[in-house]
């Protein structure tokens, strides 16, 4: 196992404040439900929890 500092979670990057309201930047997974974000890749959206993938057109 590598020694050193752990990488911090950067959940603050997934939210934005507009007009006094919190706006989510990424999509939620349709299988897992609200609270589980999908990762935004170049050609797809993918869920790290269940593996669901949506391909971009």
Curated annotation (Swiss-Prot):
Classification via SUPFAM superfamilies: Zn-binding ribosomal proteins (SSF57829)
This protein's record includes keyword Amino-acid biosynthesis: no
Cofactors (names): Zn(2+)
Cofactor binding: number and manner: Binds 1 zinc ion per subunit.
Zinc finger (C4-type): 29-50
SMART domains from the UniProt entry: Ribosomal_S27
One protein family per Pfam: Ribosomal_S27
Keywords, in A-Z order: Metal-binding, Ribonucleoprotein, Ribosomal protein, Zinc, Zinc-finger
Family per similarity comment: Belongs to the eukaryotic ribosomal protein eS31 family.
Subunit field text: Part of the 30S ribosomal subunit.
Name of this protein: Small ribosomal subunit protein eS31
Origin species: Thermococcus kodakarensis (strain ATCC BAA-918 / JCM 12380 / KOD1) (Pyrococcus kodakaraensis (strain KOD1))
Gene name linked to the record: rps27ae
């Amino acid at each position: 196992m590598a020694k050193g500092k752990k990488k911090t979670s950067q959940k603050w990057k997934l939210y934005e404040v507009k007009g006094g309201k919190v706006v989510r930047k990424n999509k939620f997974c349709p299988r897992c439900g609200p609270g589980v974000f999908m990762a935004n890749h170049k050609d797809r959206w993918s869920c790290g929890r269940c593996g669901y993938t949506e391909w971009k057109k």
